[in-house]
Each structure stands twice: as structure tokens, then as C-alpha cells.
Amino acid sequence: MRVAQSWLTEIIERTNAGWSVTPEELDAGFVRVGLEVEEVDRLERVGGDIERPLVVGRVAEITELTEFKKPIRFCKVDVGAPELQEIICGARNFAVGDLVVVVLPGGVLPGGFRITSRKTYGHVSNGMICSVAELGIGKDHSGILVLEPGTAEPGTDANELLGLDDTVIELNITPDRGYCFSVRGLARELACGFDLEYLDPAVRTLPEDAAEAWPITIEPASQCTRFAARRVTGIDPNAVSPWWLQRRLLLSGVRPISPAVDVTNYVMLELGQPLHAFDAAKLSGGLVVRTAKPGEKLRTLDDTERTLDAEDVVIADDSGAVSLAGIMGGASTEVGEGTTDVLLEAATWNPLLVYRTARRHKLVSEAGKRYERVVDPEINVAALDRAATLLAEIAGGTVEPVLSDVRVPTPAPEPIRMDIDLPDRVAGVAYPTGTAARRLAQIGCHVEVSVDEESGHGQLVVTPPSWRPDLAQPADLVEEVLRLEGLEQIPSVVPTAPAGRGLTPEQRRRRAVSRALAFAGGVEVPPPVFLPAGVFDTWGLDADDPRRTTTRVLNPLDVERAELATTLLPGLLEVAQRNISRGARDLTLYGIAQVVLPTGDTKPVAPLPVDRRPTDEQIAELLGSLPDQPVHVAAVLTGRREPRGPWGPGRQAEAADAFALVDAVADAAGVVIERRPAAYLPWHPGRCAELVVEGRVVGYAGELHPAVLERSGLPARTCALELDLDALPLRESRPVPVVSPFPAVLQDVSVSVSKSVAAAAVESALRSGGGELLEDIALFDVYEGAQAGEGRKSLTYALRFRAPDRTLTEDEASAARDAAVAAAADAVGAVLRG
């Protein structure tokens, strides 16, 4: 937000006469109360080697020069001198008699641009008629600055008139400080920072009226809690906003348009309450606040026809939607050149609905920015009074003695009880007596002092102001006191480090797994902890799939990502897609992180105290209410697993590569992971294996489903794995394998099995039948041709036999091989091939 220093000073000076600060002190004051200053922009006076380089002029004559490629005007301007000043100008938004701002020869504009007399377009131009951009007040180059009639006489020093000795402060208002999106809020923060009195400008200035300004109905589905309206009639459609108002708008980055629009923008900047002005003559019937009808259309003020969503909230009359609630008005009721009757509206909208509507329509507005951050629900009528009074003063209208103010009952904020010395204990600072109560009163809280009946300690009973819904518990109040007293007062004490105990077994296992995946060519990425909206619908999961049971965050950073992840794959796939969209093709990404799995015992709990150790019962209740949070490991493989080069064309990643990563995880964790065929989305049902440890399914691996990949924007044949690391048995120590000094006997065996039998099942059967002499087994050939037989395949394994205490004979090895084949025949129907 941009705001002029003079505007802030004006509000604070109402109760602190003569108060002034330098721009540097103002910058430091904002930073001291926790606001982020983006830029301090000092306006520059027009200087030069003449007494008055910048003056007010009145246009006396205009001659149109038509012999050039673009329209040019030869103007004679009265600048208070005996003779008219002749000036060439290309702008066309002024007429004879208008007051303009002129830089005379010898003047120097901001940026060091010197004005001189020079011949151009066949005439000598003695000066320049200025736009607000050339003066450094705004960014509008489309026309020159035209002052309101009667503003000043020709020859008046325009440096003083335009206030070019001001400073503009630009601040970055974070989402939790929505009340600072106004001069009212910023001035209050400054008053707190400099410990000054503050008088709130948001006050009612017009008498209460029983009559209704306009019929208004609020439908419950709109979630609008307040809608107020005032009417101003008989305004002059040709009126122009005075310079003081235009100047403040320009310095705030808002372009002046007309008195009705300028006043609503001005009051929004001043008080933080967005307003909208309807041309009352264009409204038909009463106003209804409702959700949009399916397929309903609205042409907004940016001249874009929008197809509305059923979740959009609109203001409608008998003809249909006339405004997109909280974001932008409609073109059909726009205040125009002939408007004489204006209906001013101020409402309180649901921030979440405004946020979603703005994102849905890709429509950003100053009103929407404020509603998304919460607007004070108690200043609607005060803002209407201010706007109506200003509009009547500027445009000569009459404020009708009627007011519509429809409210939906909402619960009042609950008082917060806080020990008086809680800020002292948290900060480790002995603040002067009464500091907490004084600081909380400064930010607008209602503060009472009481005594706790149980402990006998003094307490503050604090009711937060309407514009601070973020104050909900004692910790929030402590933060405010510490912030305003100065964080630099808190002593910097380094806590004593506990004696080192080394890594836990779980931490060692996690590191070992991470190293194993990195050695296998993987790149570790931190998986997002929140699920993308609609990801399980993209996968096609059943409605009762356990992964759909998620934990929602009450106040998420992004409303589209409010659910904690029950699986790491969505985040990893999203990271992979983002890298692929930026040119990466061959990826092996992995992540190790906790997932959140709600259970039937998961339930909300009361906040724990921050000023003392919670009781054992409170800790037990908290731990018992938490969802399960096991550590998962997941990986995604896409593109080539082996790069192409002079040695060959390379090799595409396939399910076997995902299984190889599973083996790497198993080896690092010191467990044996078996693989069994499975059908589990988002994996391909024919190329997916469930991962089993000691009879328990701990994860899945294989190639992802083609439909899921297409909907996710990922290449075909992308593979993935995910398994529950905490479900693996924790091996404190591993048995050291016995290394036999005797030679091994190598034999190959080919068996024929049904195509439906998994190779892993055959391997398991061979391993069990081979007994202790079978040291290793590896599949090295798969044949599914005609000679294998219909519906069958041939698998060839390399078997390695070795005895720890003797040299095996060929007969002993053959007997062990035959036993392995017999076990496979019993288990999976394998037939030995010759």
C-alpha cells in the first residue's frame, strides 16, 4: 500500500498538535511496530535558475495544427505575466479556460530534465504543460493535469499548491495485518510506535434514520453479515474532484475518474472499508445479496463478460446480477457522465468466498485485497457517512436522510483473560506497571482488571476490537505487547545445550535410506505437506478410500491446499511435473517425510498454555487426539534411467527400476521386502507390486496408471514407489554374514509357469526350496514366445550354491537345485524345462 506522509501526519496531528517526523523516522517507526516498508519515495520540487519555475496557468487560446502526423496544439497560456506564454502540447484533454500546470524555461523537472525555449512544429515553445507523471505525482501519461476551476490564480507557485515536498511510503501489508490496509490502521500503528494519542476517524457523522434508503434482502447462502446503503441525489454530473483529493489518490496509486468513484476510493484508502457506487436510476427493484445462478452472466466494470459460478456471491436487482460481491461492480449500473442519483453501498463479505471468486475469475481489485484480509465489520455506516458527506460537498448533491443497514446476527468476540505479568514472564523483561493494559488499549482493545479467584493473581480481561479477529488467546495479546514495547528489549540469551546423545535408531535408518536412494541416482526434494485440491479425483480413487480421509488446517496459507498429505506421491508428482515443464526430462526424485493419517480418536483439543508447563492430563489429551504421523519414503522415476550416448540409445525407466529402489531401501533398513502383484491406484494394475515385510503390506511400487499420468501432465511409463518407513522392523544390529572360503557352484534353471504368476513368487519358492545352500538367486531371462506354450512363460534363473564348511560336490548342488524346483512346482505350478 502507498500512502503520503502528509495524510498520516494529518490524522495523528488531530490529537498531537505540531507532531512531525522525518521520512527516515517514519520508516523506522513502521519497522519498529512490525510493518515491512518496501520504498520511501520523496517527491521532488521542480527547481531551476528562475524564481518560480512551476506555476499555474490558464489556457487562453488553442490553435489546432493539422499538418503533422499526430494532433498537435499551439497554446497561449496566461501564467501571470504581462504576455501570454506560447507552448506546444500534444495532449487533448483540456480546453480554453482550463487551469493547468506549466514549467517555464529554466525549470528542471524531477529526474533532471531541463526545460528550455525551443522551436518545434514550426513554433517556439516557451515551456511545457505538465502531466502528473512528469511531475512525479502519478503514472498517468495519457493527458495533462487539469485543476479544478478556482483552485488558484495564474502565476501561483505550483510547487506549493501541488505539495511537491511530500514523501510517499510504500508498505507490504501481510495477510494477517489487514487492518493496516488503510490510513486509519497505519496511523494507529504509528501512534502506538511513537506512544501518541490516537483519535479514530471512523465515526458516524450523520444522524440515525429509520427510513430505508433502498430495499435490501440478504440470502443466507451468501454468507454476507452486513449490507448498508445511503443515497445521494442531485449531484452535478460535470463536477470535478478537488485537487487535494485527486492528489492523495494519485500518490496512493489510484487514478482519479469522477467525484462518485473518487470518493469511494478515497474512503476505502482512508478507513479501509471498500465501497461501491451504483447509478440509482439504472437499478430496477430492490437489491438481493445471493449466490449466482448456474450460467448467469455479468459484465464487470473492466468491460469483461463473465460466466458466474454457483459459488460466486452477487448483488442483484430485478434484472439480474449487477455486482460481483466484494470484488468489482457491474457495467449495467456504472456511474457515468450523466449520473445524478447515486446509491452508495458498504458490505461485509466472507473473506474466503471473496478469495475464491477472485482466483476463479482471475480478477484482482483493491476491494478484493481488503476483503480477503478481513474488513472491520463495524465501520460500514461510518464509511457511508463519510463518503456521502464528501460527495455532497464536491458534487453539490443532497444526502438523503435515509439509511438501509441490514445485519445478520453474529456472535460477539469472547473476552480473553490473561495474567497481568504474562508478557513479562514470556519476554524475560520486567516491564513497568500497567504496560500491558496501556499497550492493549492503544491497539483498540477494551481492557478491564480483575483477580483470578483460584490463584489470586491479577488478570486483564481483554475484549479485542472488531478489526482484530486475529486476537484469540493470551499468546496473541502477549505478542502485541512485546511488539509495541520493542523486540530489541528482549534479552538475547543462548540456551544451554543439552549433552549430545547422538542420533536415534529411527534417525540413523532414515539417513541410511536417504543415502541409499541418493547413491542409486535419486535427488532428494522436500515433498509438499499439503495436498493439491482434487488430486484424488484426478487419480480416480473410490469415495471410501482411506487416503481421502484427511486433516484440514483451520487457517491455511493457501485455501486450495488446506488438507495435510496422507501420501507423499501427489507432492512428488507435482514437483516432477514442474521440473518437466521447465525442460528437465530424465528424473529420479525421492522424498522422506511424515504423512498425517486421521483415526477415529482424532479430535480438536483446547490450546495448551504457553506461560507454564501443561499438566500431564493436558499432554495426554493432546497426544491422544493427534492423528497418526508415520514417516514415508516415496520416489518418482521418469524419462531415461540410462542415458543415451556412443554406447547405445539409453534405456527408459520401467517398473523394474522402481523395484530396484525398493531393494535399495530394504538393504539400507536391514529388512527383506517381498513383492506381490497388486492393483492399487495410482499404479498400473498389471505393473504394480505390493511391498510386504513379515506378512504386512508396507507400500507399493511399479508403473503409474496411464490415465493418471495423462491427467497429471506427466510422461507415459512414469514409475513410482511409496512405503511406510516406520512400519519396517527396526534393526538395532544386523547379523554379520558368514563369508565362506570355499568355492561356489553355479547352475541355471528354466521353469515354465502361467503368465499370471509373478516372477517374485517363483523366486520366493525357489529360495525356500534351495535351503541354506542356496546363497543367491537372480532372474536373467523371460521368454513368452510360441514355444513357451499358450498362456505360459519361461523364466530362467541363475542359482549360486555354496557351503560354509566344505566344497560342494556337483551332486549336492544338483540335489539342492532339484529341491528348489520341486518347491516351485508345489507353490506355483512350475514345470522344469529341458
From Swiss-Prot:
It is found in: Cytoplasm. Mg(2+) binds at D470, D476, E479, E480. GO terms for biological process: phenylalanyl-tRNA aminoacylation. Its main location: cytoplasm. Residues 411-492 form the B5 domain. InterPro entries: aa-tRNA-synth_II/BPL/LPL, B3/B4_tRNA-bd, DNA-bd_dom_put_sf, Fdx_antiC-bd, Fdx_antiC-bd_sf, NA-bd_OB-fold, Phe-tRNA-ligase_IIc_bsu, Phe-tRNA-ligase_IIc_bsu_bact. The keyword Zinc does not apply. This is Phenylalanine--tRNA ligase beta subunit. Residues 48-159 form the tRNA-binding domain. Residues 740-833 form the FDX-ACB domain. It comes from the Bacteria. It catalyses: tRNA(Phe) + L-phenylalanine + ATP = L-phenylalanyl-tRNA(Phe) + AMP + diphosphate + H(+). One of its GO terms (molecular function) is ATP binding. Binds 2 magnesium ions per tetramer. It comes from Nocardia farcinica (strain IFM 10152).
